[in-house]
Curated annotation (Swiss-Prot):
Lineage: Bacteria, Pseudomonadati, Pseudomonadota, Gammaproteobacteria, Alteromonadales
Binding site for ADP: T13, R17, T266, G309, G410, N414
Family: Belongs to the FGGY kinase family.
Pfam families per UniProt: FGGY_C, FGGY_N
Residues that bind ATP: T13, T14, S15, T266, G309, Q313, G410
GO annotation (BP), single: glycerol metabolic process
Protein name: Glycerol kinase
Single GO MF annotation: glycerol kinase activity
Regulation of catalytic or functional activity: Inhibited by fructose 1,6-bisphosphate (FBP).
Described purpose of this protein according to its UniProt entry: Key enzyme in the regulation of glycerol uptake and metabolism. Catalyzes the phosphorylation of glycerol to yield sn-glycerol 3-phosphate.
Organism: Shewanella oneidensis (strain ATCC 700550 / JCM 31522 / CIP 106686 / LMG 19005 / NCIMB 14063 / MR-1)
InterPro entries: ATPase_NBD, Carb_kinase_FGGY, Carb_kinase_FGGY_CS, FGGY_C, FGGY_N, Glycerol_kin
Record's keyword terms, sorted: ATP-binding, Glycerol metabolism, Kinase, Nucleotide-binding, Transferase
Reaction catalysed by this enzyme: glycerol + ATP = sn-glycerol 3-phosphate + ADP + H(+)
Amino acid sequence: MQKKYVVALDQGTTSSRAIVFDHDANIVSVSQREFTQLYPNPGWVEHDPMEIWASQSSVLIESLARAGIHSDAVAAIGITNQRETTIIWEKATGKPVYNAIVWQCRRSAEICEQLKAQGLEDYVRQNTGLLLDPYFSGTKIKWILDNVPDARAKAKRGELLFGTVDTWLLWKLTEGKVHVTDPTNAARTLLFNIHSLSWDSKLLEALDIPAAMLPEVKPSCSVYGTTRIAGEGSEIPLAGIAGDQQAALFGQLCVEQGMAKNTYGTGCFLLMNTGSKAVRSSHGLLTTVAVGAQGEVNYALEGSVFMGGATIQWLRDELGLIRDASDTEYFASKVADTNGVYLVPAFVGLGAPYWDPNARGALFGLTRGANRNHIIRAALESIAYQSKDLLDAMIKDSGVSLKRLKVDGGAVANDFLMQFQADITDVEVLRPSVCETTALGAAFLAGLAVGFWNSVTELEHKACIDTHFKPSINADYRQQLYAGWQDAVARTRS
């Protein structure tokens, strides 16, 4: 049977999805299933690994059935996943010893403080590109080994395996034959040396983690094993893996130095490809691993805006200024500007490049003439200003000028926001036809690995741009607007 399709498994924080793409990178079928979020204690977040697997395997079957596609027509399956989330299971039985500890979980903060007290903070920054923070996998592994009965003894006997979600899915799909991850996921564990591209023995020793638990690291674009869907049909190659943000970067074909993408979700995730050079940030950005045009390791700078779409949710749910997020474009366009109003949405502090956890949200510039439309417009503009803050930091750190910004995520449907993003950053903003860029990245990696597509050059004809947003304001006005934002941020922090 002719191989006509590639399937991307997109395992996210709240749901598991399977998306079927054809040879022209069109979406043929989508299936999605949410799963349970567990909050056993304040600040703790867990998932049931078996529920992750059940939801992911069921949507894989469902996505093909929904489109009437036989599994024999599938050329390959790619995986993209929520990063950092930590699973440990028994090698012999495949049974998890504890729930998955999710990236958002803060329970291992004390372990991070212990590592800082040991003077490891700079070593971690230099060799992993990360900050010593509970966000990453390493301290979560140590917590499980320290707190689950017999876990440490079993680990030392070589009876336990660790994996991020990609590794867990690969293990289950191959019925325990393959224990592998890729560099983009390994780079989020706090245990991976991004320069030598190997597990770091000093950090394993500091966290008392046996190396035998860790998966083998293989390229993001390669064949890891095979699977049969629901035990039927021929063996399908499992052939591409990348963490969600790096998958989106590849899906946008940001495969060369200076290419960047911004994913507009609840927050915003910005990544800039820095090529073969790992750039250490002086602005609090993370240095991480990305995927190059040939599937090779590239490096990237990564930063996140805490309040992106969440700011619009606040307008809707707490202030009642809008009924639906899409209303913001209409109301923002009803006024020529914000009438001097700035919203700094520091509801949970400010992230990079400010790193001020004590900053709090504020509205500035309110006069008697300020109305609802001005506040709504200021909220949208705040997303673009925060993204500019990060992009400027990336440009300063890397010394690379940014020519264009690729965008994806739910908020890119907002033409006003996209145009203002182009105006305030003075770069062209490109919105793709297929906004499912995370899944598309996994599909591209899988398809390239098995020869379904031949090269990134071929993919450039598949990943079509829907809209080009070009800067439309002059430099003086741009500087005036941004100076107002910087002043508002400074006041928020004082």
